[in-house]
Regions:
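Substrate/cofactor-recognition hotspot
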Residues: 1-20, 146-289
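Short, structured secondary-structure elements
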Residues: 1-177
Length: 289
């Protein structure tokens, strides 16, 4: 920039920076903090329930910023891409905002999280208090809270596990209580009354793109036993070495104290032959010269 002395240097620098893919990555970090994006979710053992494909939402945020997509359109896609653009697989990634809050053990927790995160991110309000009572100092009533939550009540999330590869069709089969039970495509409407006229074949969701090829991978023992990994062993050895050095440093003053005790003991006069000093309180020792 400093070397460009031609007129319009500032505008060219701005255009160059805005056209860089790094622009979307830089500002996506800001918006992902507001929209509460994270690769893992949960605490301790709950980490295992993290959304495995949540990174697709992250990429959608970056792509949207680089494409200069309008803020209103981004909000529409995050909250209702499955309704606003059901055939747009790129836009469907935006619904990661809703999936990010999913809590498999309680639907109420999930929906309350959606309301909380939506109000904070898009309205600049905290509506948590209104979940149980009308807000004390903000104009948000108990009724307002559940009217907003009602918007998300019909939303549901499928997290079916995918099984092994079907070698004949090279497709993934979803395990169910009955493997032969047909699967029907649910687009919208009442989930309890699906259209059973057109069954669909088991396959990878189209949004994931391509075919999922599963191959057997032979892993070393360290993959099953983390304690065998070099980094873990080095850490354990370093901790043990530290304890050994600490023990050695404690032995040195103890040895010095032992020598002092021996020297002090040697100054005492030995007891006369046949007369021993007793440490019994019931039998006093004979007088010593």
């Amino acid at each position: 920039f400093l070397g460009d002395t031609r007129p319009g240097a500032y505008g060219r620098a701005v255009d160059r920076l805005l056209s860089s893919p790094r622009y979307g990555e830089r500002w996506a970090r800001h918006w992902m903090d507001i929209w509460r994006y994270s690769d893992p979710s949960g605490f301790q053992k709950e980490i295992r329930d993290s959304r495995k494909h949540i990174w697709r939402w992250r990429d959608w945020i970056i792509d949207s910023l680089n494409a200069d997509k309008g803020y209103d359109r981004m909000l529409t896609e995050m909250l209702a891409a499955d309704e606003a653009a059901p055939a747009d697989t790129a836009a469907l990634r935006a619904t990661g905002f809703l999936a990010r809050n999913w809590y498999k053990f309680s639907r109420n927790v999930w929906l309350d999280n959606i309301v909380e995160h939506s109000s904070k991110a898009f309205l600049g309000l905290t509506m948590n208090c209104a979940r149980c009572h009308s807000h004390k100092y903000d104009p948000i009533s108990h009724k307002d809270y559940y009217q907003l939550r009602a918007v998300f009540e019909t939303h549901n999330l499928r997290d079916d596990p995918l099984g092994q590869t079907d070698s004949s069709a090279i497709m993934v089969r979803a395990f169910d209580s009955e493997a032969a039970t047909p699967t029907y495509l649910f687009i919208n409407g009442d989930v309890n009354q699906p259209d059973k006229d057109i069954p669909i074949q088991p396959a990878v969701p189209r949004i994931l793109g391509g075919k999922l090829k599963i191959e057997t991978v032979k892993l070393p023992p360290s993959a099953y036993y983390p304690a065998l990994q070099p980094a873990t062993q080095e850490k354990a050895l370093a901790a043990t070495d530290k304890e050994i050095k600490k023990a050695h440093s404690a032995i040195q003053p103890a040895e010095g104290n032992l020598e002092k005790a021996k020297l002090t003991l040697s100054k005492f006069t030995p007891a006369p032959t046949g007369k021993k000093v007793t440490d019994s309180n019931s039998k006093p020792s004979p007088p010593q010269p």
